Amino acid sequence: MADERTSDSVKTRYDIALMKLNDIKIAVFRDSLSTYVEQKTGLTIQFNWPKSRCLVISTLCKIPFPTKSAAELQEMCKYQCFVSVLWCVILVFVVKIKLFFLLNKVRYYFAARKDCNYLDMFLSGERRLVMCA
């Protein structure tokens, strides 16, 4: 699947730098996370993310729905899309990742899905970085 490996590089400067990307124990899509995320000097983070996948980074302290299984999340998203109540993001792999920051320790959630067209916008006003092809 060569088209999935084609990526757009996005350079993002965070207000608060990520300190320990090495603390991430679980890789997304069974690939090394360093394939996609690289910490540059200072506050610059390099993202090399495939066009066909969506990455959501959100500073939610608690994810607003239970993460029992990928199938249950898919069903929830299908229902939400059907009734047009919320934008939907279909989660195949939900990986809870702890990242440490200079000022605060905040839990981040990475949610990624192939061919993502809808994004989770549960809580407006939250600072979040969303990248979707």
From Swiss-Prot:
Transmembrane intervals: 82-102
As for membrane topology, the entry says: Single-pass membrane protein
Gene Ontology CC: one annotated term: membrane
Q: Where in the cell is it found?
A: Membrane
In which domain of life is the source organism classified?
Viruses
Keywords assigned by UniProt, alphabetized: Membrane, Transmembrane, Transmembrane helix
Query: Could you identify this protein by its name?
Result: Protein U17
